[in-house]
Each structure stands twice: as C-alpha cells, then as structure tokens.
Amino acid sequence: MDHPPLQVKVVSADREVWKGESVNIIVRTTEGDIGLLPGHEAFLAALAPCAAQIITTDGNREVIACDGGFVALDNDGQVSIITQYATRSEEISVDQARRDRDSLRKKLNEHERSEQDPEVVQDLTHRLHLAQAQIAAARLAGKQRS
C-alpha cells in the first residue's frame, strides 16, 4: 500500500527549525535508534541527544542536532520533533562544537572529582551531549570544518 510522505516539523524552544515532507526519519530515542517511514503506526518516544536525519521527498538529507526532547507520529503521518535546542547542520561550526566538547569534558572531570553540586554535573553533561550531537550532525552532513 502506498502512503503519502510524512509531514515533519522540528521545533525548538525559540523557533521552528525545519518543516517539510519526508520519506524516512532516523532519530535516537532513549530506547535506541528508530526509523519512521510513511505508514508507520502512531508513535511517541523520548529523544536522546542525537543527530536527527530527515530524508526529504526529493532525496536530500536534512541533519539536525537535537539535545533530547520528544518525537511524535500521529495516524495521519504528522511528525513532530520537539526539543529545547536544535541546530541544522549548516548552522553548526564544527570547530566551535569540538572546542565546546573538549572544554565541557574537562569541566565535567573537574566537577566529578571535586564532588560538586549534582545539578552542575547534570548541566555540564547535558551541554556535552548537545556538543556531541552537533559534531555528529555535521559529520553526517559531510561537514568536516567551519
């Protein structure tokens, strides 16, 4: 049975990041990676920090770094990816993301050794995962430096 393309919206806290039609979406949930195709049953899951891949109807691949959130697919093929922070691969500075990752790793190690406030460690870990998702998104989009 032929199904119409998925209608996809990626929304962060401050903007609509991407909107369009897709024939395949690959995201990482807290349970593992999943692919969503037209005709997939309704679905709701918590996202892990990831590089979401959206294959458009014309065969292009949009790659978006997400810091977690939710992905929902309804019975009509409407997909919503809702996340606090999201960055399209073309907006990512790979060099900056790598510097952020390295700096956050160092800070995290220092805070863990000194047994700092768990909320500080949680915030640093969250920011580290976002930097890693940005690097992965840039890599998947074929962007090595910026």
Curated annotation (Swiss-Prot):
It is found in: Cell membrane. It comes from Cutibacterium acnes (strain DSM 16379 / KPA171202) (Propionibacterium acnes). The keyword Transport applies. Produces ATP from ADP in the presence of a proton gradient across the membrane. Pfam families: ATP-synt_DE_N. Residues 92-120 are annotated as: Disordered. F-type ATPases have 2 components, CF(1) - the catalytic core - and CF(0) - the membrane proton channel. CF(1) has five subunits: alpha(3), beta(3), gamma(1), delta(1), epsilon(1). CF(0) has three main subunits: a, b and c. Keywords: ATP synthesis, Cell membrane, CF(1), Hydrogen ion transport, Ion transport, Membrane, Transport. It comes from the Bacteria. It is a peripheral membrane protein. The keyword Ion transport applies. Its main location: membrane. One of its GO terms (cellular component) is plasma membrane. This is ATP synthase epsilon chain. NCBIfam families: ATP_synt_epsi, PRK13442.1. Belongs to the ATPase epsilon chain family. Residues 92-116 have a biased composition (Basic and acidic residues). GO terms for molecular function: ATP binding; proton-transporting ATP synthase activity, rotational mechanism. CDD domains: F1-ATPase_delta.
